[in-house]
Amino acid sequence: MTRAFYIGRFQPYHFGHHAVIARIAEEVDELVIGIGSAQKSHEAIDPFTAGERVLMVYNALEHLSIRHYVVPIEDVRYNSIWVHHVVSRTPRFDVVYSNNPLVIQLFREAGFCVKESPLYVRERYSGTEIRRRMIEGEKWEHLVPKPVAEVIKSFDGVSRLKNVSTSDSNFSL
């Protein structure tokens, strides 16, 4: 049995992530999905909480054909211990999928088999672009699985993102 690990911030989870996970699912028996930077939320580039992101991923993958685990993973201060940190918080895994150069480097140095996951139409499916659309009031729902849009709407995530993205430079005491 082969169990893989794939990590992302999922701010928000989108069809690019969905395509990569579907491809990984064709190659392995189980998948551990790490919610990276789990401690971050309520910021312009990280507006959603770990719990909200877990729900997005869980709901989007309801029909995934393989067993999967969704695990929040907080950042650590030192990259040299990050892999150990990940391993201590997840079920054991045999292979890592990533396209992030730092993640690839750290896991290879730790002796893991690493496979690069191709980006899926990155210019269209990127968290940065989706958040920009949300802030600007443009259509974004077609870039994420329907269950993800439903989760974001359930806690008024677009309003939160707009609020945390507003500059306070005009504020004075």
Swiss-Prot record:
One BP annotation, GO: NAD biosynthetic process
CDD domains: NMNAT_Archaea
Reactions this protein catalyses: beta-nicotinamide D-ribonucleotide + ATP + H(+) = diphosphate + NAD(+)
GO terms of molecular function: ATP binding; nicotinamide-nucleotide adenylyltransferase activity
Enzyme class: transferase
Pfam (any one): CTP_transf_like
A single cellular component GO annotation: cytoplasm
Localisation per UniProt entry: Cytoplasm
InterPro entries on file: Cyt_trans-like, NMN_Atrans_arc, Rossmann-like_a/b/a_fold
UniProt pathway: Cofactor biosynthesis; NAD(+) biosynthesis; NAD(+) from nicotinamide D-ribonucleotide: step 1/1
Principal cellular location given in the protein's record: cytoplasm
Keyword annotations: ATP-binding, Cytoplasm, NAD, Nucleotide-binding, Nucleotidyltransferase, Pyridine nucleotide biosynthesis, Transferase
EC number(s) stated in the UniProt entry for this protein: 2.7.7.1
Gene3D superfamilies: HUPs (3.40.50.620)
Coiled coil: none
UniProt xrefs under PANTHER family: BIFUNCTIONAL NMN ADENYLYLTRANSFERASE_NUDIX HYDROLASE, PHOSPHOPANTETHEINE ADENYLYLTRANSFERASE
Family from the record: Belongs to the archaeal NMN adenylyltransferase family.
Protein name: Nicotinamide-nucleotide adenylyltransferase
